[in-house]
């Protein structure tokens, strides 16, 4: 497997830390050892997150093509668009962001705080669109690309989550390689890796990266899209493509893609009671914040799997904390009492 043949523009500090979640582990019985890999601490650009790791492999292409404007898309509280805006500012590029109404939630400040507020401060051209949530290419995004061209600019297209992009899976192949280096230092290997999945390329990259040492099926995706069939298809397709790109040496099949569908409801962006319990429990036991859209749902999934005895006793489980905390501000009413 050869990731090094792809150019990479450094946007992160380096390997992200792995933190023991000892108090949470003990609270859940102490039979499973939980750790977090802190992708939420990976960069100094507007709080970073998993998309920043992915963008390291997209940006060289944007620069090589002479593009002057990054154009991306997400929901109103999209972490993706905030990270794209930050990277564009760092590079001295323009940025156009399509922010669709992906979440069936209303709060007086939802479209004025958190991620979207940061994107505006970073200088992005933020365009609100009423369209609802779906996975795949969006007309509003294609219209934004065309508007840049019509104005004489040269856009670089970054789809939702960086996912449906030829280079979108590479960053998290690198994540797996990084984990292996850290495991050598720690003196043990993780038995399972838990990660949130929606647009798919984060888990897809992990599946390919961990397939290199036989652990593809130990990557447990927690669906947060509430459209798991679409998410599963996208993970599998991106993983197959990424495996070919990096020369994995074997095909990725549906057996390699594990996606737990139990924790994503009631719909994308709306927390359930378990999500909220997990957010508060992790915060109060570990001082680690998660969000209602993504990480709260994957944290809920991991907690319930421990409670249900789904991890064998003595397992070491690595939780991939992908970021997303700025979105908490958009849910201020839900958390008005903590």
Curated annotation (Swiss-Prot):
Cell inner membrane as a keyword? no
List the active-site residues. 78
Q: Which residues form a coiled coil?
A: none
The N6-(pyridoxal phosphate)lysine modification is found at: 51
* Record-listed E.C. numbers: 3.5.99.7
- State the family named in the UniProt similarity comment for this chain: Belongs to the ACC deaminase/D-cysteine desulfhydrase family.
Protein known as? 1-aminocyclopropane-1-carboxylate deaminase
The major lineage groups are: Bacteria, Pseudomonadati, Pseudomonadota, Betaproteobacteria, Burkholderiales
């Amino acid at each position: 497997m050869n990731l090094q043949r792809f150019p990479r523009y450094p946007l992160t500090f380096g390997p992200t830390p792995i933190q023991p979640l000892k108090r949470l582990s003990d609270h859940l019985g102490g039979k499973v050892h939980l750790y977090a890999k802190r992708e939420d601490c990976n960069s100094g650009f507007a709080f970073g997150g998993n998309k920043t790791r992915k963008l390291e492999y997209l940006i060289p292409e944007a620069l090589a093509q002479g593009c002057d404007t990054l154009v991306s898309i997400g929901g109103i509280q999209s972490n993706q668009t905030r990270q794209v805006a930050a990277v564009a500012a760092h590079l001295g590029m323009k940025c156009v962001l399509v922010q669709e109404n992906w979440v069936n939630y209303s709060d007086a400040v939802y479209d004025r705080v958190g991620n979207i507020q940061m994107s505006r401060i970073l200088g992005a051209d933020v365009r609100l669109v009423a369209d609802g949530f779906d996975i795949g290419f969006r007309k509003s995004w294609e219209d934004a690309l065309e508007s840049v061209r019509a104005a004489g600019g040269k856009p670089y297209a970054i789809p939702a989550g960086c996912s449906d992009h030829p280079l979108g899976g590479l960053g998290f192949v690198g994540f797996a390689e990084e984990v292996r280096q850290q495991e050598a230092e720690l003196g043990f290997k993780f038995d399972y890796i838990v990660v949130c999945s929606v647009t798919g390329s984060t888990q897809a990259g992990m599946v390919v990266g961990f397939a290199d040492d036989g652990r593809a099926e130990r990557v447990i995706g927690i669906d947060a899209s509430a459209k798991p069939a679409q998410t599963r298809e996208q993970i599998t397709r991106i993983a197959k493509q990424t495996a070919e790109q990096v020369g994995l040496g074997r095909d990725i099949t549906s057996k390699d893609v594990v996606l737990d569908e139990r924790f994503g409801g009631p719909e994308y962006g709306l927390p359930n009671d378990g999500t909220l319990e997990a957010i508060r429990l992790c915060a109060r036991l570990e001082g680690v914040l998660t969000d209602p859209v993504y990480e709260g749902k994957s944290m809920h999934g991991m907690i319930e799997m421990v409670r249900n005895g789904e991890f064998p006793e003595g397992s070491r489980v690595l939780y991939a904390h992908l970021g997303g905390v700025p979105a908490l501000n958009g849910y201020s009413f839900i958390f008005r009492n903590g």
